[in-house]
């Protein structure tokens, strides 16, 4: 007999089909099993579309009666942009529901499970729970903290440099690593850089055709000391948002507006204020691809929860060559920020280290 764990892993595989497309909604996959046979399966494709359970029920049809439904996230029990999934499950005659994890959304949070049990449906909760939570880590964080999940990505040489002393950085890593980054961008709703990166690198910041939708390209600059011409100002390729302060260069602001680049003027430009703005724009997870100065600000404010660090087998030297993270004010090694749940993998000739910033992953606050 096929185990509950196997069917739940199938739900996770289905859910991953829509990575980068569901924001601000979670990733949800569902499987309906009659005996040992899968009679229906589906996933939530994007916000506003039916949830994964509904697609699975549609495919199962009459064979859903008396069957077991598997879903990685608790079925909703409220009327949103789509009807409650619990009522559809009840009406279909499902006998048992196996849930990967409870939905952290206060609108759901156990209410879906209670409704199903009230209707006489057997409910099992917590199958492959850790994997289910990891898949929707950005959704869970956003619900809990009312801001997007922050990811900091950088690439450096063996001696810890992200560019030469002359600011040349093309390329620190291999084409394989860069393709991986393009995939990561396709899973994020926004990519953030600072003015220095625009001036030095003139980046494009798209997913280079890896995904269907490019992330919003966000430039942070208090002064608006930005080049008149840049790839980011081409709005036919992807949309760009420039965020600045009231003391900015008004000529540059006017120039950007003429180019139809969206601008936003804040009283005070901080990483936290930016993340709050992106939360209002329905972002689930945001990628920080900035230089060291802005990265240090983002980390210090608790707006980075996860780190992807590429290590390239190169040495370039240079006392003045920039490093990934600027000044954090630490004086002793005991103050260092530790990464948890560390994972490393080889991508081409480079190594990728992935982990979570201790103190920034659970409570959303920096421990600096």
Swiss-Prot record:
Active site (UniProt): 53
Cofactor binding comment, as recorded: Binds 1 zinc ion.
Residue segments, region Reductase: 147-368
EC nos: 3.5.4.26, 1.1.1.193
Annotated metabolic or biological route of this protein: Cofactor biosynthesis; riboflavin biosynthesis; 5-amino-6-(D-ribitylamino)uracil from GTP: step 2/4; Cofactor biosynthesis; riboflavin biosynthesis; 5-amino-6-(D-ribitylamino)uracil from GTP: step 3/4
PROSITE patterns: CYT_DCMP_DEAMINASES_1, CYT_DCMP_DEAMINASES_2
CDD domains xref list: Riboflavin_deaminase-reductase
Reactions this protein catalyses: 2,5-diamino-6-hydroxy-4-(5-phosphoribosylamino)-pyrimidine + H2O + H(+) = 5-amino-6-(5-phospho-D-ribosylamino)uracil + NH4(+); 5-amino-6-(5-phospho-D-ribitylamino)uracil + NADP(+) = 5-amino-6-(5-phospho-D-ribosylamino)uracil + NADPH + H(+)
Occurrences of domain CMP/dCMP-type deaminase (ranges): 2-124
Pfam families hit by this protein: dCMP_cyt_deam_1, RibD_C
Annotated region (Deaminase), positions in chain: 1-146
Entry binding sites for Zn(2+): 51, 76, 85
Sample GO molecular function, one term: 5-amino-6-(5-phosphoribosylamino)uracil reductase activity
Positions that bind NADP(+): 155, 171, 197, 201, 291-297
One biological process term in Gene Ontology: riboflavin biosynthetic process
PANTHER family (alphabetical): 2,5-DIAMINO-6-RIBOSYLAMINO-4(3H)-PYRIMIDINONE 5'-PHOSPHATE REDUCTASE, DIHYDROFOLATE REDUCTASE FAMILY PROTEIN (AFU_ORTHOLOGUE AFUA_8G06820)
Protein's recorded name: Riboflavin biosynthesis protein RibD
Record lineage: Bacteria, Bacillati, Cyanobacteriota, Cyanophyceae, Synechococcales
């Amino acid at each position: 007999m096929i185990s509950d764990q196997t069917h739940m892993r199938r739900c996770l595989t289905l859910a991953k089909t829509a990575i980068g497309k569901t924001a601000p909604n979670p990733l949800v996959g569902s499987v309906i099993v009659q005996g040992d046979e899968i009679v229906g399966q589906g996933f939530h494709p994007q916000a506003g579309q039916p949830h994964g359970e509904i697609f699975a029920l549609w495919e199962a049809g009459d064979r859903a009666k008396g069957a077991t439904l598997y879903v990685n996230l608790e079925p909703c029990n409220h009327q949103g942009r789509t009807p409650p999934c619990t009522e559809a499950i009840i009406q279909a005659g499902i006998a048992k529901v196996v849930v990967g994890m409870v939905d952290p959304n206060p609108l759901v949070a156990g209410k879906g499970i209670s409704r199903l049990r009230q209707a006489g449906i057997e409910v099992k909760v917590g199958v492959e729970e850790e994997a289910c939570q990891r898949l929707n880590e950005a959704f869970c964080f956003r619900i809990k903290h009312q801001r997007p999940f922050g990811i900091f990505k950088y690439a450096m040489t063996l001696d810890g440099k992200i560019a030469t002393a002359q600011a040349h950085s093309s390329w620190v890593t291999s084409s394989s690593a860069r393709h991986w980054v393009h995939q990561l961008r396709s899973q994020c709703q926004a990519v953030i850089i600072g003015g220095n990166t625009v001036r030095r690198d003139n980046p494009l910041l798209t997913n280079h055709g890896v995904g269907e939708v490019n992330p919003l390209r966000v430039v942070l600059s208090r002064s608006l000391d930005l080049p008149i011409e840049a790839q980011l100002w081409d709005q036919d390729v992807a949309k760009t948002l420039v965020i600045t302060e009231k003391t900015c260069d008004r000529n540059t602001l006017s120039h950007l507006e003429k180019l139809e680049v969206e601008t936003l003027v804040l009283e005070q430009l901080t990483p936290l204020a930016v993340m709050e703005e992106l939360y209002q724009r329905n972002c689930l997870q945001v990628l920080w691809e900035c230089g060291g100065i802005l990265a240090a600000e983002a980390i210090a404010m608790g707006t980075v929860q996860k780190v992807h660090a590429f290590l390239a087998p190169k040495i370039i030297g240079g006392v003045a060559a920039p490093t990934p993270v600027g000044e954090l004010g630490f004086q002793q090694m005991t103050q260092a920020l530790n990464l948890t749940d560390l994972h490393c993998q080889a991508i081409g000739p480079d190594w990728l280290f992935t982990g979570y910033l201790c103190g920034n992953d659970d409570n959303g606050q920096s421990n600096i």
